[in-house]
């Protein structure tokens, strides 16, 4: 299981590189990576475990964030009443289509790899379709909207060497299209 000390911080070269594709069948090392990234998310979202291990809660974790230049990310988006909106390890993910409609989180975005607060709207597509492989190597395609779509775009950005604050308008950080969806 990963702890906060294992999270690669902003400034590390691996966070700005394009991650390498993952080959199948998965190596034991890649299986462990997938397991450990998802385990971090599960434990970080459990209040008691989070406190015990001094973790920052997360909804996504990409391999570059643990120092691995591999195109793999774990996503665990909780909903209301312990419902899970989306839980998957995405391997070699690609956004194959996106909506014209924009969206942003009202509170802005954060990142386990970025310790400072960076205020501003991170403007993203409100709806996306992604293709990826699961841990068994099966090719999948899924359509996501709102918060799960934003989380997946954030994680896929990590695999392309992009950090959330790269999307914030430097001159006017809270400027956004008036038709954009603001997710609270």
Swiss-Prot record:
This is Peptide deformylase. It catalyses: N-terminal N-formyl-L-methionyl-[peptide] + H2O = N-terminal L-methionyl-[peptide] + formate. Belongs to the polypeptide deformylase family. Disulfide bonds: none annotated. Keywords: Hydrolase, Iron, Metal-binding, Protein biosynthesis. The active site is at residue 155. Its cofactor is Fe(2+). GO terms for biological process: co-translational protein modification; translation. Binds 1 Fe(2+) ion.
């Amino acid at each position: 299981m990963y702890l906060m000390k294992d999270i690669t911080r902003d400034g590390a070269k691996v966070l700005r590189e394009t991650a390498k594709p993952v080959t199948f069948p998965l190596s034991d090392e890649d299986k462990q990576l997938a397991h450990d990234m998802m385990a971090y998310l599960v434990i970080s979202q459990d209040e008691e475990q989070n406190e015990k291990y001094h973790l920052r809660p997360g909804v996504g974790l990409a391999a570059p964030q643990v120092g691995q230049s591999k195109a793999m990310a774990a996503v665990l988006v909780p909903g209301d009443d312990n419902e899970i909106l989306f839980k998957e390890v995405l391997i070699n993910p690609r956004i194959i289509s996106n909506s014209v409609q924009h969206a942003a989180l009202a509170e802005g975005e954060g990142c386990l790899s970025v310790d400072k607060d960076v205020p501003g709207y991170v403007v993203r597509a409100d709806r996306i379709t992604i293709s990826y492989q699961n841990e068994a190597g099966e090719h999948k395609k899924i359509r996501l909207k709102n918060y799960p779509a934003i989380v997946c775009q954030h994680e896929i950005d990590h695999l392309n060497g992009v950090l959330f604050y790269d999307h914030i308008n430097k001159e006017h950080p809270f400027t956004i299209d008036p038709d954009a969806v603001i997710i609270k």
